[in-house]
Amino acid sequence: MKMKFMTFCMAACILFASCGTTMNNKGKGALIGGGSGAALGAIIGGIAGKGKGAAIGAAVGAAVGTGAGVAIGHKMDKKAAEAAKIEGAEVEKVTDTNGLAAVKVTFDSGILFGFNSSALNSKSKVALAEFANVLKEDPTIDIAVFGHTDKVGTVEANQKVSTNRAFAVQQYLQQCGVTPAQFKEVKGLGFSEYNEAETAEQNRRVEVFMYASEQMIKEAEAAN
């Protein structure tokens, strides 16, 4: 499975290519975690798609220290490696609004759903059940789920489909034992973040973000 490292200091456009490289998040966690409050405050953009959908990150209200950044980076490295073993998942290491390591897992909607459908197929349920195990291991991880579509059909129809798909993924992950409180945002973005450089099929996707909760940050700060 492919893993890529991309760091965003402002609202960023996240794309996935045919191949990528893996970098360790620990050093980056130290670099960003040790920055000034002003520098961290500048990291304001959303990291879902082109940044227009949502910003992810716990509302901690202060810069996160170096040691905590390293610890969280280590946790996210582990989660990224585990998620990368799941068939049909694209894994990217990204940065949340606190400047901390986070993980984006993209599931191609062609794998999860039939055309214009939000019903999960049997193959996708196997992949999501495996992914649920990754999420259940650490209830201090916050989760955001975003659905995307291609441009076929009306804005309204695509918004509805993308929303239903995002909630279908959330609900199945919960059925597999993921704590409901971990889900901080679940929404459809339709084709508002359509990437013209990708195919229509690649734009039909569901993205799941794993990032540090306020509890995880507090625990990391206390331990460091």
What are these regions, as identified by a protein language model?
Residues 1-9:
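Bacterial N-terminal signal peptides that target proteins for export
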Residues 14-18:
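C-terminal motif of bacterial Sec signal peptides marking the signal peptidase cleavage site
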Residues 20-82:
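Short, low-complexity, glycine-enriched hydrophobic/amphipathic alpha-helices that associate
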Residues 75-104:
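Amphipathic, membrane-active segments
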Residues 81, 85, 122, 126-133, ...:
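Solvent-exposed, polar/charged alpha-helical surfaces in well-ordered, non-transmembrane soluble domains
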Residues 86, 98-102, 106-108, 138-140, ...:
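Extracytoplasmic
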Residues 112-147, 208, 215-224:
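Periplasmic peptidoglycan-binding/anchoring modules of Gram-negative envelope and division proteins
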Residues 148-219, 224:
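Periplasmic OmpA-like peptidoglycan-binding domain that tethers envelope proteins to the cell wall
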